[in-house]
Amino acid sequence: MKYRSRTEIVSEILEVAKGDGVSKTRIMYGAYLSFSQLKEYLSLLLHNGMLSYNKTDKRYRITQKGHEFLRAHQSIEGMLQDKN
C-alpha cells in the first residue's frame, strides 16, 4: 500500500462518515486505519469541527465544515490529475 498523506486520510474518513453516521469500527475499516491512528484522527477532526459525535447512538457524522473540506480536497485533486 502506498504512503497516504494526512489530507488523504482525513478525506477518506470524511467520505466514510457521510450519510446517517458511522461507528468507530466502520471508520477504521473503511479508511484502513489502525485503532491508534483512528483515535488520533477522530480527535483531530472533532477538535476542528469536521466531524460530530452523537453520544446517544454512538455515531460520527460529517459536519458542514467537513463537507467543505471534502469539496476543496476533491477540487485540488482534480487540478492535479494527469490530463493524458
Give the positions of each predicted feature.
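Short alpha-helical segments that sit at the start of domains
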Residues: 1-11
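Basic, amphipathic "hinge/linker" alpha-helix immediately C-terminal to the N-terminal HTH DNA-binding motif
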Residues: 58-73
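Amphipathic alpha-helical dimerization/coiled-coil segments
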Residues: 75-84
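Short acidic, hydrophobic short linear motifs in intrinsically disordered regions
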Residues: 21-30
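A short, conserved structural fragment
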Residues: 46-55
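Short amphipathic alpha-helical interaction segments
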Residues: 32-47
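Short helix-to-turn junction characteristic of helix-turn-helix DNA-binding domains
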Residues: 13-17
